[in-house]
Amino acid sequence: MSKMEQLAQKLQQSAHAEQARAAAIEKQYQDWIQSLHVLFDTLELWLQPLVQAQVATLRRDTVTITENPSSGELKTYAAPALTLNVNGKAAAIKPLARFCFGCQGRVDILARENQWHLTRHLEPKEVWYLHTHDRDQGRELDADVLASVFAAY
């Protein structure tokens, strides 16, 4: 095999590896967006007692997120978000990014002057945790934990 043939083979392998890496990152984004839809469906279900009691309204929105995964290329995508009005006060639940330090995605809850973070962890199964600030361990998200966010309303 000539040096040119070796070079061609090496460049082909490099191109295939890059395509595989790009496809893997794209799959992570698709899984992230699907996970967000499931999360927001669940949040809407948990918030239904407030809606039925006519103390809250919910509106599903779409936000545009641009982030820079480790690949170095900017990625822009549309993701679901939730706008709430609870007891006359505005709140928003918006994804921040898929690629975050220490987790596999983060969603912020902005309510009054407070902010909470939902972090997504995939090992051994997908679990969301609510954090009151960056340093706390977080509590596994469920309807009761979500209720604690809006208890001061």
Which role fits each region the language model picked out?
Residues 1-25:
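N-terminal, Lys/Arg- and Ser/Thr-rich interaction peptides
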Residues 2-5, 96-108, 137-148:
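Short secondary-structure transition/capping segments
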Residues 10, 14, 46, 148-152:
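Residues that form generic nucleotide/phosphate-binding pockets
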Residues 20-36:
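A short, compositionally biased N-terminal segment around positions ~18-40 that is enriched
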Residues 31-77:
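Short, well-structured hydrophobic secondary-structure segments
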Residues 61-119:
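Hydrophobic-cavity lipid-handling domains and compact docking modules
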Residues 110-153:
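Glycine-rich, aromatic-bearing surface loops/beta-hairpins
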